[in-house]
Amino acid sequence: MPLPPPRFHHLHLNSRDPDAAIDFYVRRFPTSVKTRWGGRPALGAPNDVLVLFDRVATPPPTSPQTAIWHFGWHVPDSRRTVESFRGQPDVELLPLYTGDDGGAVLVSSDTWPGTGGVLGRTKAQIAEAKATAVPPTRTGGFGYLRGPDDALVEYAGNHPAERFNHVHLYHEDPFCAQLWYQRHLGAQVPAGRTPPAPVTEATCRVPRGPDRTFPALDRDGMFRTPSAAVAFGDVAFPSYMRQGDRPLVGTRGHLYDHFALAVGDLDAWVARLGDEGVALLEQPYRLGDTRAVMIEGPSREAIELVEVR
């Protein structure tokens, strides 16, 4: 009998001061609440999503790059959110470089919109946008702030309600990773994010797009193709190919330590994943008043399966 697909449970962060970190996020995203789960301090979002925290003695590393790039929220009005953040002295808003002679904006809708389904433009496409007087939309868009412990946090609008909505990943091969999540964990592919042509294990490895795009947190732009995505419930996992030439490292012990999915029958999942050759990082263990197991994803991301009956 097929196992019901997991749902997203939590993102797990390492922090020098979990209580201060949670307070920071509650002030920025006020539909969230400070809570506890499994004996750990936690942030609770209104869509039944948690961010759990472990206290660490030293700043949690954010490099070398792991498979987890950042996490983010939907907001009803991203431009109003930016203006609100501007007035808060403990918020550091991060510039998005536009690829236009060092120009930068705080929200993507203040520069040229993406094209061809990509959230950015190459320098050649920027030149074309200038030549044809393509205007910024000045509505919605995405931006970033620096969170506690050097976390990278995205806010994106305009959406019906504020909620935790995604964990953005890097993968060695995004389409292969998408297949892995579908095959082993029953992930869904969000509407509009299916590959342009059917992908198989024989065809999922594709080269990284040659051109960087803007806006981007890096002055030199970022590679946005190929792009893939999966989802568990209403939490999405979009992904790009890793940006540099160094292989991604494991997530354990880093700022973004792992993410967790809720399953109904842990023993059945352990048996299934074992039969499928999925790597176990930790055998089943107690987690609060339930049990969990830690597996490894296709780009060395640690994934916790939490039994929730």
Regions found by a protein language model. Give the residues of each.
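Mature N-terminal segment immediately following signal peptide/propeptide cleavage
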Residues: 5-37
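Conserved beta-strand-loop-alpha-helix junction that forms the acyl-donor binding cleft
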Residues: 12-17, 168-174, 197-198
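Vicinal oxygen chelate
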Residues: 1, 86-169, 191-231, 238-242, ...
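Helix N-cap motif at beta-to-alpha junctions
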Residues: 16-18, 75-80, 173-174, 263-267
